[in-house]
Amino acid sequence: MIGLIFGETDFPKYIHKKLKTKKKYTIVDLTRGHVFKKDRNSYSFSIGQFGKIISILKKKKCKKVLFAGKVHKPNFSKIKFDLKGLYYIPRIIKKAKLGDAALLKEIINILKKEKIQTISSTSFTPELTLTKGNYYTHRPDKKDQSEIKTALKHLKRSNQYSHVQGAISRNNHVTLEKKGGTQKMLKMS
């Protein structure tokens, strides 16, 4: 049995359609409109009901979970928490201030402590991933390769706690993705 923790966007719908007949699953629906409520294996929760989410995953014997879709950052002062949610909330708020990557890592660590493994969504959707290589007709020239090396050097310099996920390098000026997200990085470059 696999636990599917779904948020907004079309990606969860794609995974659901693909797994519907192939695997036994339980859906944790974190969407605002409860998109998956018609599925009999779906359970709707708010983000603060962490204890209920973990207990339903354990009750349904889900040893693995998969995250897909976007969950909007909540206003933590307006959320109703259960006991486990209250226990974990200080850590979650602290990581949420660092950015989405830090928050997701913290949730994965919490699930790991509860003996629930997180798996990649690409394990069920390999057709959506690209293999290593150039997918554009333009080959990088020496200047492009130099810019790529500069960006990689800056990415490698960032530590695991900075949660940098991307870099843009132009004319030896490097812009790193920080907690503002990818869109902010693209605007700054």
Map each language-model feature to its residues.
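A charged helix-plus-loop insertion that forms the helical arch/lid used to bind
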Residues: S77-K97
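N-terminal basic/disordered segments at the start of proteins
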Residues: M1-L30
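Conserved mixed alpha/beta catalytic, RNA-binding, or beta-rich assembly cores of soluble enzyme
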Residues: E8-F11, S44-I47, K97-A101, I107, ...
